[in-house]
Amino acid sequence: MNQTTYNIIIATDSFKGSMTSYEAGDAIATAIKEQTPSRVTVYPVADGGEGTTEALSFGRAAVLPQCITVTGPLGEKVQAKYTIFGTGEEKTAILEMAQAAGLTLVPVSQRNPLKTTTYGVGEMILDAVRKGCKKLIVGIGGSATNDVGIGMLQALGASFTDINDQEVSDGAEGIENIAAMDTTGILKKLKDVDIKVICDVNNPLVGDEGCSTVFAPQKGADLQMVQRMEQAITRFADLFAKEYDRWLAGAGAAGGLGYAFAYFLHAELVHGIDLVLQEIHLEEAVRTADLVITGEGRMDAQTLMGKTPAGVARLAKKYAVPVIAYAGCFGDGIEQCTESGLFDRVYAVTEQEGAFDPQMAVRDLGQKVRETMSEWIHMIDTKKGANE
């Protein structure tokens, strides 16, 4: 056993289908502690997708899971879960819009973004605010909608009426008929509430890269529907939000929900990994580390595009701390990771793509750590020697 004590920070994403972020980190930590008396700290992390709630609520006081009945994407009632933690001014709710308006809630045969609504998302927000939350963190991935958040805003108290002074219908088709709007009641309800929206796409509201053109076909729209929604949303922006930037990066996320959050609710659109790292105060720990270990189930070219390992590695490199990554497997473009300069070493547990057997995942990851540990310990010692 190596008797040198190292300060090691472990911050891996989940290995999807096999291990949560904490389980993966704990498997690595256990293997390390068998070989060296190092100080090893595990931080669950995520990039806005699976495991984000776990990462943000880990180690927090008064974590309270919530389950409420809200309006689903087709107007039906669905059960939506979210989490509250903290107290007082720090009382925070973590919500995922997909719980109320996610694509998985809509049968394939009924997917039609002209009809689907974000009304339930607004109901979730109201519930959290009524329970005293002063901070909201909202993930907006996996939506079934393209209504520019009109449904959410209606649930929060806004009114969107047609030429007959009647409330418009649900979904993107309702946008076509909006003649007037009144949003005065919304900000009163959300007074002193800070909202951060996890948004990991940079698409604008309209245009060739906008929400209708790029994402609506994935939600059941045909070409005619796409053109119809693009025209309606452009008209809406012209009439009611002309001074606001429809080209804002992220405005087109979740069928324009990013636009509604930014413009009407004054929310901040943030990248998932950046928010998580900030909220868990990882930078403070990384500053004095001898080594940072990160990873995810599959590392490939997409890893560098806002994924957890890249975010963690960039933070470590800010303080010239060595970084190694363990992946369940490698995918196309892994050489972009190895040549990026972010990672000092990258290891794959298996050459086979796809999820591990969950029962074998912890064992196999731990074994890979044991097999490679001498290599990266030598790297740390060499770096320390060079700095002395």
Q: PLM features: what roles do these ranges have?
A:
Residues 2-140, 144-388:
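N-terminal loops that bind phosphate or other acidic moieties
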